[in-house]
From Swiss-Prot:
Keywords (A to Z) from UniProt: Early protein, Host cytoplasm, Host G2/M cell cycle arrest by virus, Host nucleus, Host-virus interaction, Modulation of host cell cycle by virus, Phosphoprotein
Compositionally skewed regions (Polar residues) per UniProt: 49-61
Record region (Disordered): 20-64
Native organism: Human papillomavirus type 54
Post-translational modification: Phosphorylated by host ERK. The phosphorylation triggers a structural change that enhances keratin binding and protein stability.
GO annotation, cellular component aspect: host cell cytoplasm; host cell nucleus
Gene Ontology biological-process annotations: symbiont-mediated arrest of host cell cycle during G2/M transition
Protein name (Swiss-Prot/TrEMBL): Protein E4
Additional remarks: The major E4 form is first synthesized as an E1^E4 fusion protein from spliced E1^E4 transcripts, such that the first few amino acids of the E4 protein are derived from the N terminus of E1.
Endpoints of the signal sequence: none
Length: 91
């Protein structure tokens, strides 16, 4: 078999070539985790409702449309050039 020919098993199983690839070097910089907020706490539903009732803040008009169906949330918007973007999150 000549050096420029690929062995038959590599044609049939191309992923076998990955066995001969060198290991990736370990990155020198490891990202750090963000610091937790010391005052953050989980709010109960009734606290959220009372806050919403007493707040005079009105939400600004946004170009986003949010739709929920069962266990999914869909967000729809349009870019400045008119392209529609739809993101669906399945919970």
């Amino acid at each position: 078999m000549a050096d420029n020919q690929v062995p038959k098993r590599h044609c049939q199983y191309p992923l076998l070539a990955l066995l001969n690839t060198p290991d990736q070097p370990i990155p020198h910089h490891v990202p750090t985790t963000p610091q937790k907020q010391s005052r953050a706490r989980r709010r109960l539903e009734n606290e959220l409702e009372s806050t919403a009732q007493t707040s005079n803040h009105t939400a600004p008009q946004t170009p986003w449309a949010v739709t929920t169906t069962g266990t999914s949330v869909t967000i729809t918007t349009r870019t400045k050039d008119g392209t529609q973007v739809v993101v669906t999150l399945h919970l």
